[in-house]
Amino acid sequence: MTTLQEIFTYFAKFPQKAGVLELFNRSASDHFPVYASLKTQITALDPHSLIPGIKSYVFGIDEQSIKKRIEEISGTYLFVDYGNINSREDNLKRRTDEILIALTVATPLHINTLDMVEQVLLADQALDYLLQIMAIMRQDSRCSPFVKQLTFPVEITPFLARELSDSTGWTMVVKKSGISLL
């Protein structure tokens, strides 16, 4: 399994399964033979829906696809973004690779109808979901080779994206690092 498929699959266990399966528009792909097996793997994912309050899954870096997906969502979503791949080589010619993974739990407001107290409560709920994800990841670090390669955040930041249906929530960034990951 490639690095991005591994990231996609691991974090797919947190939102409701139906919200993850919405990302698959086909039963198979003419361009990518692994598509059908990835869909089967996600369908059979166990455990799944670990945080039932997170209804949808958004994954990727393409701004237009992300924007379109979030416009279709009502309720809280988990948005997984990735990037900034770095490779370094030490004196012994061992290559260490790192990739940043941003996890955002947010809710699109579509039309800002919440008062300031409701906004605080919504932000509190998103932060709670993100902290639940982090707690599960820490538990998984004992047995999951994928999670063992993650460094946990020292900073969790507020997320407000007007261009994403006025989504509001919280983001944490983790780093996956290891010898010859890529």
Locate the predicted segments by residue.
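Small/polar-rich, solvent-exposed N-terminal microdomains that initiate assembly or binding
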Residues: 1-91
